Each structure stands twice: as C-alpha cells, then as structure tokens.
C-alpha cells in the first residue's frame, strides 16, 4: 500500500531539518527527503568548520554543531527520513501529490514543502592553467577540517563572506594566512571585514593569480599580477591554496517535475503563507522568492512555521491553530 504523509519536505539542509521538527511539533505525519547521503546541505558539505553568526541565540555556532543540534531536535518526533534519495518527479491527482524517487518507488503527500535551497551546487573554478591537476595536492575548493592546515602557509583566493570568514578562522591555526582578491574592497558583511582588518591576515589586493607551479619541496609557487594589465607584482610560496569564488547552483531536477510553480531564477515565487502558485505546494529558505527576501539560514528558520501551519490549514482547515511551545510536553515522540 502506498504510504501517505501529511507533509513531504524535500531538501534536508538546515531549513528542511527545522521544518521537519516543527511539522512533528504540530503532530503531523512528515517525511524528509534528501538527495545526499547525510543531512545538512551546504553547511555539512561546504563549511562544517565555519562559524555561523546570524542564528538567533548564538554568538557564533560551528556549522557541524548546528546540524548536530537540528538532528537531535528532529529525533524528538518519529520523522521519516530518506537520505540518498532524489525526488525525480512530483505529480498532482485530485487532492494528493505523488512523489516519485530515484529507485522508482513513490509515496503520496497531502502537501509539499520545498526546502532544496538553490539546488545542486559546485564550486566556481579558478581559470588558471594547471589548477585542476593540483586539486587535492595543495589546492582545495572545500575545507572539512580546519586542523588540516595547522602551521601551514595558506592563501585564500576570493573576496566574499566565505573567503573572509575562512581566512580569519584558519589564521588562528596557520603559520601564515594570505587573502588574494581582485579588488581593494571586499564584498562581505561589515563586521567580517572589520575582523579581517584587525587580524594578521596578509592582504594581496587588488591582485589575481596568474600562474601556479608545484615546487620540488611540495610548496605552491603562486605568481600574482595586476588585474588591469596582467603585470606581475610578486610571487608567494604556500603549502595550500583555498579557492573560494562561490558556487554555481541549479535546480535542474526540481524544474523537471510535472508540477511547475512560477519561479524567479532558481527560486519559487511565494505568497505571504509561503505557498507557491500551485495550491498545496510551499517553498521556503533559499528555494523561495518574494520582494525583499534575504537568503539567510535565520530567515529560512522563521519561514518554516509559517509554511507548516499553512500546509495544515490546507489539508485540515478545521484543525486548531498552533499553540505556544512553552505549554507543550513531549514524551516518547508524542505531544501530551
């Protein structure tokens, strides 16, 4: 018999995880589907060591610690979690949605909440000869353990939030840290730039990487040049180069489903209840778009209760609204 859920949450990043918890708090039968082998989305895959500063109640929480806490929170309820599972199609028949997954099986749901972010992601590559051959041999696009760089000479290429945060974080453990950016000004949050300016991180600006050579001692010789005229400015020798030019995202699989809500780029247009142009289908976090939207984890957390409560009103209009969580008691995965 086909499994029927009240809510199907598609996307197991931090916003999807909190949505699943809140769906449990509202005593719904929920399933959380994630294409990767582990939950946590980009936080787990890209910056588990990075401190996240804009989550309410924390002066800064490491990415992996945030995901661990969200996982513990979800365990309060019997949420059905499907990892290594890609949703290949979503169709609607009468009042139910049929969700087909990559093994060919399917289940049904009364409502859908899309929490896929901007979709799959891959790093923007550095367009310098020889870089691809040196990935894993001193050149990195991802950092999963900051202590891999203890006492190393490290350079970070990039000028956005992630590059600056990486530089200031690693600078506590490295022998030396440099940041290479094409402009004099960094494109990051003001406090992050201020923290960088007060640190001992060496700024190589405005410069670009023009050549990289692996030396006999294992170090990387990086030739830097002026951005405007390609004139060489200086060489630096480092153990590691971390390329942090951001990521390219696409929701190709989502945009291949039979149901197709209106979208704005990679995100779906939503109303004030976080509902898309298809009744019963909601989108939150980076997967949603409305005027003034800020793509932050904190914003997605706030949108989760709105979407879950709206979903409940959709499939059960007579159910009473949400109470205050401080008046609830959870025992053995149930609200009592």
From Swiss-Prot:
It is an enzyme of class 1 (oxidoreductase). It catalyses: 2 reduced [2Fe-2S]-[ferredoxin] + NADP(+) + H(+) = 2 oxidized [2Fe-2S]-[ferredoxin] + NADPH. FAD binds at residues 34, 42, 47, 87, 121, 286, 326. Its EC number is 1.18.1.2. Binds 1 FAD per subunit. The keyword Acetylation does not apply. It comes from the Bacteria. Keywords: FAD, Flavoprotein, NADP, Oxidoreductase. GO terms for molecular function: ferredoxin-NADP+ reductase activity; flavin adenine dinucleotide binding; NADP binding. The keyword Chaperone does not apply. Homodimer. Belongs to the ferredoxin--NADP reductase type 2 family. This is Ferredoxin--NADP reductase. The lineage of its organism: Bacteria, Bacillati, Bacillota, Bacilli, Lactobacillales.
